[in-house]
């Protein structure tokens, strides 16, 4: 699975509320071939300013709805 395949999966997990980083990883893990795939998709979303991490360790969507 490519990083682009994972982007909508991650965004879907974040659509209702911020999610703790570890919990997000656990939810996405079944779709990963390697743990570095998670790092890649998170880097991509951060670079696109689509997701960020708050001071509580929660990942949240930055995109306007």
Predicted regions and their residues:
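Short alpha-helical segments that sit at the start of domains
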Residues: 1-13, 65
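Short amphipathic alpha-helical segments
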Residues: 8, 21-22, 39-42
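A short, conserved structural fragment
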Residues: 46-56
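Minor-groove-contacting beta-hairpin "wing" of winged helix-turn-helix DNA-binding domains
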Residues: 58-63
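Short acidic, hydrophobic short linear motifs in intrinsically disordered regions
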Residues: 17-28
């Amino acid at each position: 699975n490519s990083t682009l395949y994972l982007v909508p999966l991650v965004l879907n997990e974040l659509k209702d509320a911020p999610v703790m980083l570890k919990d997000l990883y656990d939810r996405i893990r079944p779709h990963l071939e390697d743990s570095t795939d998670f790092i890649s998709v998170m880097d991509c979303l951060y670079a696109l300013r689509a997701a960020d991490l708050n001071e509580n360790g929660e990942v949240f969507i930055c995109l306007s709805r």
